[in-house]
A protein has these predicted regions:
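The serine-hydrolase catalytic nucleophile loop
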Residues: 44-57, 74
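Conserved alpha/beta-hydrolase
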Residues: 57-79
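Alpha/beta-hydrolase
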Residues: 37, 72-74, 137
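Accessory cap/linker subdomain of secreted extracellular hydrolases
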Residues: 137-194
Length: 194
């Protein structure tokens, strides 16, 4: 390969996150570097799914183009420490900020490339002016509730459900999201003819 890789780790509070730094030939402090943040659900540094490793492929292409990357295992996965629990997007953003700190010690121009939830995290970091640039791959530009409703609606329609069948289910989901944010009693599916 026309680049080097280096196994690294960084900490965020009680968590140690492990990853792979991919360094193009002739890299220096002036080489741009991207922190790669995975999408929702626990994922390894390569965002591996069905033996496909999209983050490894992207890191390879970027290194060949002269851009360094750091991709890392999510909390509690691969070589990263943690016991599984309920983590939020804010928690994963905090992990990404810790990764950016590691990169800033070695590089002058540091950005974030995020996929799905990682794209949203990239935008959150950019809004705080903590990255020099970002790349969002399918990051949400609408609320999480709106995204989940849309995803469920599309999935159910794709499975052949009619609008009349999908509507009460999505109404129940809307109520559940509202209860999760504002408190109250979770909806009973029987009340929605689901």
């Amino acid at each position: 390969f026309p680049y080097a890789t280096e196994e690294v780790s960084f900490t965020n509070g009680d968590y140690t996150l492990s990853g792979t730094l991919t360094l193009p030939e002739g890299y220096s402090r002036k080489t741009p570097v991207l922190l790669m943040v995975t999408g929702s659900g626990q994922q390894n540094r390569d965002e591996e799914l069905f033996d496909h490793k999209p983050f490894a492929v992207i890191a390879d292409a970027l290194a060949r183009a002269g851009i360094a990357t750091l991709r890392y295992d999510d909390r509690g996965l691969g070589d990263s420490s943690a016991k599984p629990m309920e983590w939020t997007t804010e928690d994963f953003k905090s992990d990404a900020l810790a990764g950016l700190e590691l990169l800033r010690r070695r590089f002058d121009k540091v950005g974030v490339l995020g996929h799905s939830e990682g794209g949203t995290i990239a935008m959150m970091i950019a809004a705080e002016n903590k990255a020099d640039f970002i790349v969002s791959l399918a990051g949400m530009a609408i609320s999480g509730a709106e995204t989940l409703l849309w995803q469920n609606r599309v999935a159910l329609k794709g499975l052949g459900f009619t609008d009349e069948q999908v509507a009460p289910y999505c109404k129940m989901l809307e109520t559940a999201f509202d209860v999760r944010v504002n408190g109250g009693r979770m909806p009973n599916p029987d009340d929605y003819n689901v």
